[in-house]
Amino acid sequence: MPPKAASKGAKKAASKAKAARSTDKKKRRRRRESYSIYIYKVLKQVHPDTGISSKAMSIMNSFVNDIFERIAAEASRLAHYNRRSTITSREIQTAVRLLLPGELAKHAVSEGTKAVTKYTQSK
């Protein structure tokens, strides 16, 4: 007796499995971007003999993302109020002054100005 031909359902399952295998090769893992290397570099500048746990690094990364989003949102709002379509360093500076308290804002503005000056001179 000749072997039975594969049923329709079995053929579909086999073709789905083959399709899944071919897409697995093409699928690349998405890179998770974080500020952890930069946070680590700053930590080593300030306290060379101190380490940081992965949980603490995760918290610091969330903090940096949160502050970044707040500054970006405030700068966007300021640009909108002044009917501007571009966020410039002036909007960022004003947003920082509005968001951060007292002395912290002054230090942030001076460090930001220093960074922008260094960047423009390197070009």
UniProtKB/Swiss-Prot annotation:
Record PTM: Monoubiquitination of Lys-118 gives a specific tag for epigenetic transcriptional activation and is also prerequisite for histone H3 'Lys-4' and 'Lys-79' methylation.
Region (Disordered): 1-32
InterPro entries: Histone-fold, Histone_H2A/H2B/H3, Histone_H2B, HISTONE_H2B_site
SUPFAM superfamilies linked to this entry: Histone-fold
Domain of life, per lineage: Eukaryota
A GO cellular component annotation in the UniProt record: nucleus
Record's compositionally biased regions (Basic residues): 9-32
Pfam families: Histone (PF00125)
Compartments it resides in: Nucleus; Chromosome
SMART domains xrefs: H2B
Primary site of residence: nucleus
Covalent crosslink: Glycyl lysine isopeptide (Lys-Gly) (interchain with G-Cter in ubiquitin): 118
Keyword Transport belongs to the record: no
Keyword field: Chromosome, DNA-binding, Glycoprotein, Isopeptide bond, Nucleosome core, Nucleus, Ubl conjugation
Glycosylation, residue list: 110
One MF annotation (Gene Ontology) recorded for this entry: protein-containing complex binding
Job description of the protein: Core component of nucleosome. Nucleosomes wrap and compact DNA into chromatin, limiting DNA accessibility to the cellular machineries which require DNA as a template. Histones thereby play a central role in transcription regulation, DNA repair, DNA replication and chromosomal stability. DNA accessibility is regulated via a complex set of post-translational modifications of histones, also called histone code, and nucleosome remodeling.
Similarity comment: Belongs to the histone H2B family.
Complex formation: The nucleosome is a histone octamer containing two molecules each of H2A, H2B, H3 and H4 assembled in one H3-H4 heterotetramer and two H2A-H2B heterodimers. The octamer wraps approximately 147 bp of DNA.
Name of this chain's protein: Histone H2B
Organism encoding this protein: Urechis caupo
